[in-house]
């Protein structure tokens, strides 16, 4: 994959998603990935900030962009237990304290769902966009209706992740 990306005639990003260990971030950066995501979303705020700052320290000198998550996008097998919407003030503080390049936020999507039966919080995304000036990312977007994907973009999302139906 990395070699294909290097040979590509169009700009290509090779991204490590949802790494929870800094060793995985180091390995991806050393291997030539151009983007990594450190996922400390299940950690308390201060611990998430701390681990994310280290990921930025590892990646930034090598020109690798770093994404992180604040709030928690749940999984279809246990969506309510681990889902926590992103607080705009917390997102603003997190972005300022960590220096990440992109921020994944939780506004109602759920990982691994082929059809989404949840209410997306478009107003929440707008409020986050007002205070966070880096690119916002939406995870767990498989099954979101096209019209809602467009609304997410209109409300400030610049990257939308989906993979469940591609597996």
Predicted regions and their residues:
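Alpha/beta enzyme core
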Residues: 1-11, 18-134, 146-157, 162
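Thr-Gly-centered strand-to-loop micro-motif
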Residues: 138-140
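Short, intrinsically disordered, charge-balanced linker/junction segments flanking boundaries
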Residues: 165-167
């Amino acid at each position: 994959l990395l070699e294909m990306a290097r040979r590509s005639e169009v700009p290509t990003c090779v991204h490590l998603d949802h790494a929870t260990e800094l060793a995985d971030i180091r390995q991806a950066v050393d291997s030539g990935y151009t983007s990594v995501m450190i996922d400390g979303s299940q950690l308390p705020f201060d611990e998430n900030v701390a681990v994310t700052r280290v990921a930025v320290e590892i990646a930034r000198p090598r020109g690798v962009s770093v994404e992180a998550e604040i709030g928690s996008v749940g999984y279809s097998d246990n969506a309510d237990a681990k889902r926590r919407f992103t607080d705009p003030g917390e997102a603003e503080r997190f972005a300022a304290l960590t220096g990440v390049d992109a921020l994944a936020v939780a506004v109602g999507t759920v990982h691994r769902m082929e059809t989404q039966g949840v209410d997306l919080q478009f107003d929440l995304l707008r409020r986050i966009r007002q205070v966070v000036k880096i690119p916002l990312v939406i995870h767990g977007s498989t099954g979101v209706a096209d019209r809602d994907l467009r609304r997410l973009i209109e409300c400030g999302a610049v990257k939308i992740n989906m993979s469940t139906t591609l597996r």
